[in-house]
Regions:
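C-terminal intramolecular chaperone/autoprocessing and neck/assembly modules of extracellular spikes
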Residues: 190-196
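Hydrophobic packing positions characteristic
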Residues: 1-189
Length: 196
């Protein structure tokens, strides 16, 4: 028998749902909430009239004081969740995402399921590829500028839109250093020393 003090507990008459995220940016309380068009429940309700849904997050995700990581959801994501108020259906809580056809990331297809990709809606992304004999790490800006570390630990940095700028640099190598370019300029405002 359920004690009277628990009769109105949120878990009573749980109602599950499947829906699609339609708003991720306008939460007035800035709590990371989203609006979800719940299939079969909110079909005829305008997006602006939908209630804000809380999101269940992993314990490694920051929820205060900017600690932890925050990846967030994107509009168009299919989600699974429950209504905390049961049949009233006004307190939605998102528990997880459900992939649907068309959600495949084009960068992930070639090496699926060995690579993990984190991509923002603006096109910035990180990729960790565990494909055997082709392990690599890559981080890329939406402009195309990126750095990549291959399976042997070699690093490539490519700044497509600008020139990399470093305040101080020291280059040491156990072998040969080769500089190749149509024009090579070496300028020193005080001294240029070349020793052999």
């Amino acid at each position: 028998m359920i004690p009277k003090t628990f009769i109105d507990y949120y878990g009573d008459e749980t109602r599950w749902f499947l829906g699609e995220v339609v708003d991720v940016e306008n939460d007035p309380k800035k709590l990371g909430r989203v609006k979800v068009k719940v299939f079969g429940v909110y079909d005829n309700i305008k997006d602006e009239d939908l209630p804000w849904a809380q999101i269940v997050v992993p314990i490694t995700q920051g929820v205060h004081e900017s600690k932890g990581q925050y990846l967030g959801l994107l509009e168009g994501t299919q989600v699974f969740g429950m209504f905390l108020d049961g049949k009233n259906s006004q307190l939605p809580m998102v528990i997880g995402t459900v992939p649907k056809e068309g959600d495949e990331n084009p960068r992930a297809k070639a090496n699926y399921p060995h690579n993990k990709i984190y991509q923002t809606k603006r096109g910035h992304y990180k990729e960790y590829d565990d494909t055997k004999d082709n392990e690599r790490i890559r981080e890329q800006h939406s402009s195309g500028t990126y750095y990549e570390i291959d399976k042997d630990g070699n690093m490539v940095i490519d700044a497509t839109k600008s020139e990399p700028k470093i305040r101080n640099i020291e280059i040491k190598a156990s072998g040969k250093i080769t500089v190749t370019a149509p024009i090579v300029d070496i300028n020193g405002s005080e001294n240029v020393k070349i020793n052999s």
